[in-house]
């Protein structure tokens, strides 16, 4: 089961989530329109195990990274059985 990893605009590019991930799902890359020292992450969700360590490591009050487990996303779309 793959999980959905969403990085929000409140990300400050500190890389705490990248370092916390045990499966190297997150990678910091430059993005179009980025300002000095701002970076975005490129999640490889097929390797995500859903441990949510990236969420715990996020220092922003806005929780800039979220992991949605497969059953959370299917429930929100009305696809659960």
From Swiss-Prot:
It is an enzyme of class 1 (oxidoreductase). Binds 2 [4Fe-4S] clusters. Cluster 2 is most probably the spectroscopically characterized electron acceptor FA and cluster 1 is most probably FB. Apoprotein for the two 4Fe-4S centers FA and FB of photosystem I (PSI); essential for photochemical activity. FB is the terminal electron acceptor of PSI, donating electrons to ferredoxin. The C-terminus interacts with PsaA/B/D and helps assemble the protein into the PSI complex. Required for binding of PsaD and PsaE to PSI. PSI is a plastocyanin-ferredoxin oxidoreductase, converting photonic excitation into a charge separation, which transfers an electron from the donor P700 chlorophyll pair to the spectroscopically characterized acceptors A0, A1, FX, FA and FB in turn. Its main location: plastid. One of its GO terms (cellular component) is photosystem I. Its EC number is 1.97.1.12. This is Photosystem I iron-sulfur center. NCBIfam families: PS_I_psaC. Residues 2-31, 39-68 form the 4Fe-4S ferredoxin-type domain. It is a peripheral membrane protein. PROSITE patterns: 4FE4S_FER_1, 4FE4S_FER_2. Keywords: 4Fe-4S, Chloroplast, Electron transport, Iron, Iron-sulfur, Membrane, Metal-binding, Oxidoreductase, Photosynthesis, Photosystem I, Plastid, Repeat, Thylakoid, Transport. The keyword Chloroplast applies. Its cofactor is [4Fe-4S] cluster. [4Fe-4S] cluster 1 binds at residues 11, 14, 17, 58. The keyword GTP-binding does not apply. The eukaryotic PSI reaction center is composed of at least 11 subunits. GO terms for molecular function: 4 iron, 4 sulfur cluster binding; electron transfer activity; metal ion binding; oxidoreductase activity. It catalyses: reduced [plastocyanin] + hnu + oxidized [2Fe-2S]-[ferredoxin] = oxidized [plastocyanin] + reduced [2Fe-2S]-[ferredoxin]. One of its GO terms (biological process) is photosynthetic electron transport in photosystem I. It holds the Pfam family Fer4_21. [4Fe-4S] cluster 2 binds at residues 21, 48, 51, 54. SUPFAM superfamilies: 4Fe-4S ferredoxins. It is found in: Plastid, Chloroplast thylakoid membrane.
């Amino acid at each position: 089961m793959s999980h959905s990893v969403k990085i929000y605009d409140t990300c400050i590019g500190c890389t705490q989530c990248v370092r916390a991930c045990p499966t190297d799902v997150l990678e910091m890359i430059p993005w179009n329109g980025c300002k000095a020292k701002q970076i975005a992450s490129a999640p490889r969700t097929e390797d995500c195990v859903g441990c949510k360590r990236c969420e715990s490591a996020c220092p922003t009050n806005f929780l800039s990274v979220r992991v949605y487990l497969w059953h959370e996303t299917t429930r929100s779309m009305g696809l659960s059985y």
